[in-house]
Design a protein with these regions (language model features):
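A short helix-loop
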Residues: 2-4, 11-12, 27-29, 128-132, ...
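Glycine-rich beta-strand-to-loop/alpha-helix junction loops that act as flexible
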Residues: 74-77, 140, 265-273
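A contiguous, well-structured pocket-lining segment that forms one wall/lid of small-molecule binding clefts
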Residues: 190, 194-263, 270-281, 285-288, ...
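Short glycine-rich, Thr/Ser-proximal phosphate-binding strand/loop in the N-terminal lobe
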Residues: 6-49, 155-162, 288
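Short, well-ordered amphipathic alpha-helical segments that serve as non-catalytic structural scaffolds
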Residues: 32, 50-65, 247-252
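Glycine-rich phosphate-binding/hydrolytic loop that grips phosphoryl groups
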Residues: 116-120, 289-316
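Short beta-strand-loop/turn "lid" adjacent to the catalytic site in phosphate-handling enzymes
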Residues: 60-97, 101
Length: 316
């Protein structure tokens, strides 16, 4: 059990998140950024504005226990790469640094992707995976990637190396765009899932691949054509998910052939989808987080901060 009391902050698109890890238990709070009906996202300037307004509200939900924090973890960029940057993370970074100075505790920075992976492992009670290499899929509106994760002994807890990705649209983008076509709220994943499950047809889908990388740009056009032809919403939703899942399945198969039968982890909001979870668990024995730890959250940075403070991944 993690003993360190740690605070996690994450201000990504499209959720303001805070989490408190105390006595091994996680309290996680979050608030979606407001997106107008019919729109499929926010400009970064708007995201920064809404995070600035919402973060104090989200922090208030954690109550006075924050004063017992001994470390803070914060998401500072989308991915663990030098060219990875997004202005919305500056809101969380600024809050973390101010709190760290006020409380006299260390602030540890991690990528948003590392946070997703850590939250999924924590939720599935599989932090032991950090002791050896594994494949981690991060599926969201901004990312559709598989990375090779490996233990790190320089204080980072673990490192990630890009192994496969979408060459164009991301899985979450496709789902959100098709959802908006169907008149669903944004983000659309949680609303598209039950529609797809209600479809009585068996949809045959073939993935468009280049090596282990996938292409998802054609899925939106297929679904748009179905909508224009008057197809039931359930059929459109099921078609969307069938093609997305076929692509992820093909990526996983190619990577297992390349790297061997490594453990496979799924994180990110798209990983909440029930059809994806069922297929990947049955076929690959994949590890999934609880849905609330799949979507954007700050549990991952809190877990990683605690691991850092407890010496995990540090050279002895």
């Amino acid at each position: 059990m993690l003993e360190t009391c740690a605070l996690g902050l994450d201000t990504s698109n499209y959720t303001t998140s805070a989490a408190l890890l105390q006595n091994g238990k996680m309290t996680s709070c979050g608030k979606l950024l407001p997106v107008k009906p019919g729109e499929i996202g926010l400009r970064q300037s708007d995201a920064v504005f809404h995070h600035t307004r919402q973060l104090p509200q989200v922090m208030a939900q954690l109550g006075g226990a924050v004063r017992h924090v001994r470390a803070i973890g914060v998401s500072d960029r989308p991915r663990d790469a030098e060219d990875s940057y997004m202005p919305c993370f500056l809101v969380g970074i600024g809050a973390a640094e101010m709190l760290g100075q006020a409380l006299g505790v260390p602030v540890h920075r991690f990528s948003h992707q590392q946070g997703h992976i850590a939250a999924a492992l924590y939720s599935a009670q599989r932090l032991d995976c950090l002791e050896r290499p594994f494949l981690a899929f991060h599926l969201s509106g901004g990312t559709t990637e598989a990375v090779l994760a490996a233990p790190d002994h320089t204080g980072k807890v673990f490192t990630t190396q890009l192994a496969a990705r979408s060459l164009d649209l991301k899985a979450g983008q496709v789902i959100d765009r098709v959802g908006v076509l169907l008149g669903l709220p944004f983000p659309a994943g949680r609303h598209l899932d039950p529609l797809a499950c209600a479809c009585g047809e068996k949809i045959r889908a073939r993935a468009s691949m280049k090596g282990a990388d996938c292409s998802l740009s054609g899925v939106e056009n297929k679904c748009r054509a179905l909508v224009e032809s008057g197809a039931p919403k359930e059929t459109v939703a099921a078609t969307c998910m069938a093609y997305v899942i076929a692509a992820i399945d093909a990526m996983c198969a190619a990577l297992r052939e390349q790297y061997g039968a490594l453990p496979v982890l799924f994180s990110g909001g798209v990983s909440s989808n029930s059809m994806l979870r069922a297929q990947m668990t049955e076929k690959y024995g994949a590890v999934f987080a609880e849905p609330r730890f799949s979507a954007d959250n700050a549990a991952g940075p809190a877990v990683l901060a605690a691991l850092r403070e407890e010496g995990f991944g540090c050279a002895s």
